[in-house]
């Protein structure tokens, strides 16, 4: 590949010294920066080559003294490699060779060539983690499960297929290694990051693999393969983080479809799914490609003939990919491509047919929150110069606002010019920011940039304390960083701007030399991509593949060592293990080789850069127990966060807690401080909770609404730098009803009932309401489950259990009530109000129905109007000998049924305690009570006996006469009959 220019860190330090000398000599800051920029440009033009390094594994976390480091020089002036004595190279005069460093430490590697080349400082660890996990996945559709086959491999002896992740079974060396690890007690398991579930394998197969079966999942996709702490030849296995979701469908294009591309000469355009970065789409000036495995395989994306003209097909301006379909922006018009259609979106879908400038979607995956009422949440935002649209899962849009309304909100004259530049979602899942361009007299060459934030919770717009002046022709884009606070990175073609700490720290990103124009440091190239991750890394890629690095909350950018030449067509993206990689596109190669991915060792490159810059992290360790991005908090619950920072003595660091969103919680903090061996350790325990009491309030539902919401929090050290590798933990606490929670009565199950539906009749005298006829009821087994059959006189106390999507949580210890859903009233309770400790008369169904006439029985009594009977100040005196109709786990109150007859009862149970849950927790169960056989009527018995006796006597009389007839016919008459006379012959 053609080569690119590269300045070296030694030159950078010299230029920094030169700039300081110029400033001390009285030269203006602007002139000093111009001199330095000119020298940087000259250096980049004069250096004509680059070099890279690789290891056998795609995972650079095992970069150690055991690794075979492949060195590769790209250029024509190579002479030899300059390496330290602690390392050995196979061939010092070969541009491609292998390096081995047997001693841990920072090793300076440099090629000797015709021009002065850049040197890298490679950090080689003496790690005991040498082996890696390998896995394959088979999707099983009939039961929606996935079969994961796992084995161990050593990158230094693995097969080529294993190294490029195309192997279907282990190689011989991997099979032997896996069996040896199994003998030593190794057993892998898959751990899901979000729901924290664990899946274990069966025994090792004859092929030397473990097999794990797990269900397909769309909301728990981040997984880790872990194992026991087992070593072989002093080497352990590294944990493998990866994404595994339900199969993402790739739409194949029928023959005859036509290419859909970006304009000729445009840089590559990339879009990936918010939660599944392996599901992506790449648009080039030749073709558009789609993948579901980070471009290990791909298909072409084309347009059906007759919909777009030739010019339109080569005018793709923006693209956004979803599982439901893909949206293309062509000449201001949005087109939707799904499995069934390729169609233009217009006013019938709620969006303008022309004039659309762009669209965006959420950049951060917040599955657990977004899956709550997902159909009611927007999935993308589109905009024109004057209008902002919100798009939903059906790809229908609604208008959020327009510039006329925004002018009124901002109190701007209608004669001012206000245009929408861009729109982005915040890290807060229900907020979006609109970037506005404003000018009163637009004849000047500058314009003011404003930001307003829309809250979907309150449906309000808020103007932020942010203002930026840019040239009129500047095209501005922006992203919200992975932060609880609305931290922003913005960029035009040449500069990067920042806004940190809720718009209180605003400015322009500069390099250590003070330069803010990144194009001047990259041969005049424009900004192509800005990639952000959850750790706070921000990579700015220029069109000529020069890359800069910015750390979140840091206002300085550093230029990274050149990795790719200036003419290669590339984009940066994340692979299935959430690591940064580079995707190359070369239209001149065979079709199956046109796209190639290459891991990029970002951390190693940063360590090499920081060696010359002298940057260091102010703390040694920052730890916490925040293992999830999403926490749910119900009434009576609390969340305890443990965090700890270790730093050199006298630095005075501390842990900062920042929050954003609804202020619906209170928290307390407990600090512990320790000094030992010149280091300070601060431990902070933070407890989040609510103090609101919902009992005895008149506005129960309104009070609940005021105390529910989403609160975003982050814990961070008070000081940090570019070299701090630990990320600030960011999480959200959703206070409110958890839709996955439900209750069940112990012993009842709807799914394993073998009975069939049946009908029964309830006597009208047994109903709460008066009816003219008996009530016939159809018992639906699927709805009510199997009824529990109770013997004569047996009482029953329901034990209520609380569950969520992961199974049983606990036994409910709160008060609850129940009622028969068909209106039966022929049951009671075994304890009285007095026996349960009541001072005043307790609430009953009869009293609540009397207080709330014309209200459905389900709403007559509940947590909204519950009043306890254990205080003189609440309620009124009355008959305490009445049955107590409130139950709980500890009061031993039981349900009683009449013993004189049998009956079928279908009950609905409701949690009554107003301080137990934001959810309306109810369940249904059925009881079949077996009563005594009722005594028959005396007259009926006498009549029955009379009939039986009459029948018996009648039979006797008839049998007597029948016997006489037979006796006379066959005995008497033959004896008295004269013999017949014989005839004579």
UniProtKB/Swiss-Prot annotation:
Which cysteine residues pair off into disulfide bonds?
Answer: 87-101, 130-235, 275-365, 439-442, 617-724, 737-919, 753-786, 838-869
Task: Give the transmembrane ranges.
Answer: 938-958
What is the protein's known function? Auxiliary component of the CatSper complex, a complex involved in sperm cell hyperactivation. Sperm cell hyperactivation is needed for sperm motility which is essential late in the preparation of sperm for fertilization.
According to UniProt, the tissues expressing it are described as: Testis-specific.
Keywords for this protein: Cell membrane, Cell projection, Cilium, Disulfide bond, Flagellum, Glycoprotein, Membrane, Signal, Transmembrane, Transmembrane helix
Say if the entry is tagged with keyword Glycoprotein: yes
Those parts of the protein on the Cytoplasmic side are 959-985
For membrane topology, the record states: Single-pass type I membrane protein
A GO cellular component entry from the record: CatSper complex
Q: Which residues are glycosylated?
A: 91, 143, 292, 502, 517, 565, 749, 830, 888, 915, 920
Major site of localization recorded for this protein: membrane
Q: What name has this protein been given in UniProt?
A: Cation channel sperm-associated auxiliary subunit epsilon
Give the signal sequence positions. Answer: 1-35
- Similarity remark: Belongs to the CATSPERD family.
Residue intervals on the Extracellular side: 36-937
* Oligomer and partners: Component of the CatSper complex or CatSpermasome composed of the core pore-forming members CATSPER1, CATSPER2, CATSPER3 and CATSPER4 as well as auxiliary members CATSPERB, CATSPERG2, CATSPERD, CATSPERE, CATSPERZ, C2CD6/CATSPERT, SLCO6C1, TMEM249, TMEM262 and EFCAB9. HSPA1 may be an additional auxiliary complex member. The core complex members CATSPER1, CATSPER2, CATSPER3 and CATSPER4 form a heterotetrameric channel.
Q: Where in the cell is it found?
A: Cell projection, Cilium, Flagellum membrane
